[in-house]
């Protein structure tokens, strides 16, 4: 089994400091370098206005320390994101209808009392959380993404083409203008992901994609959506990448949404 290292938010120099092969990290926890491509979906394409109406930028705060994640609108009052994004946060500001995250259509701020993490979340497993929001009306720039149906809960999505989206890096005390990017990726088998990261990390609760030509999710994309190209269903939540960097070719890992459809239904009443 491959080694596993889980890094803290304050960790720096991740690519040079690790010696364990095929370690991984939450994208939230990678070092941020201003001015480089590390802060966004790597080697993706700029999103057009209204192309990804279901994504929200999520700016989280803990005692004045800020970090950036993504999330997906699944209902008028619900956003789905990664549990590791909400860990330790006192509040979250949600940016709706934005291509440039400094220019959202509107914004809501909610306290941590509105966070519902999956009860068995630990480290890398069960990495999902709900955020209860004020009511949001849908239109061309702001809309929900549908979950897979309960009948589709056993679909592996292996070899399906999917799309990830995100803005990228959190910022260190400065307002860096970032534009929303998208990238098309292909789902690989759980066995392929386990061969790279080990079975403790890439469990049946994980869905992985290959990252050819440096195309991948990266820091700041945590919690963002992975959506099927055919049918537009939310099947993954950005969770982890190789700790050696986003462009080294290691699989990118997402929380497998179909494993949690019943829990989401119980908490929100949303199901298909």
Swiss-Prot record:
The active site is at 84 (charge relay system), 127 (charge relay system), 222 (charge relay system). Abundantly expressed in the larval gut. It comes from the Eukaryota. Residues 41-269 form the Peptidase S1 domain. GO terms for biological process: innate immune response; proteolysis. Disulfide bonds join 69-85, 193-208, 218-246. GO terms for molecular function: endopeptidase activity; serine hydrolase activity; serine-type endopeptidase activity. Residues 18-40 form a propeptide. Residues 1-17 form the signal peptide. Keywords: Disulfide bond, Hydrolase, Protease, Serine protease, Signal, Zymogen. It holds the Pfam family Trypsin. One of its GO terms (cellular component) is extracellular space. It is an enzyme of class 3 (hydrolase). Its EC number is 3.4.21.-. The keyword Signal applies. Belongs to the peptidase S1 family. Its major function may be to aid in digestion. This is Serine protease 3. It comes from Drosophila melanogaster. The lineage of its organism: Eukaryota, Metazoa, Ecdysozoa, Arthropoda, Hexapoda.
């Amino acid at each position: 089994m491959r080694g596993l290292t889980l890094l803290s938010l304050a960790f720096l120099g991740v690519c040079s400091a690790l010696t364990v092969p095929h370690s991984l990290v939450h994208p939230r926890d990678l070092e941020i370098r201003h001015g480089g491509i590390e802060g966004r979906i790597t080697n993706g394409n700029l999103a057009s206005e209204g192309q990804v109406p279901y994504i929200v930028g999520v700016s989280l705060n803990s005692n004045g320390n800020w970090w950036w994640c993504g999330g997906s609108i699944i209902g008028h009052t619900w956003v789905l994101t990664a549990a590791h994004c909400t860990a330790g946060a006192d509040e979250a500001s949600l940016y709706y209808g934005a291509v440039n995250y400094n220019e959202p259509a509107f914004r809501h701020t909610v306290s941590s009392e509105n966070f519902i993490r999956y009860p068995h979340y630990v480290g890398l497993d069960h990495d999902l959380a709900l955020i209860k929001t004020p009511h949001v009306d849908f239109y061309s720039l702001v809309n929900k993404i549908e979950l897979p149906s309960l009948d589709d809960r056993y679909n592996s999505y292996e070899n399906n083409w999917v799309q990830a989206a995100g803005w990228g890096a959190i910022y260190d005390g400065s307002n860096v203008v970032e534009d929303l990017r998208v990238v098309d990726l292909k789902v690989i088998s759980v066995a392929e992901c386990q061969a790279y990261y080990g079975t403790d990390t890439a469990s049946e609760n994980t869905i992985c994609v290959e990252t050819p030509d440096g195309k991948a999710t990266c820091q700041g994309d945590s919690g963002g959506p992975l959506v099927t190209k055919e049918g537009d269903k939310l099947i993954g939540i950005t969770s982890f990448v190789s700790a050696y960097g986003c462009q080294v070719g290691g699989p990118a890992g997402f929380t497998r949404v179909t494993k949690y459809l019943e829990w989401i239904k119980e908490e929100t009443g949303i199901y298909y």
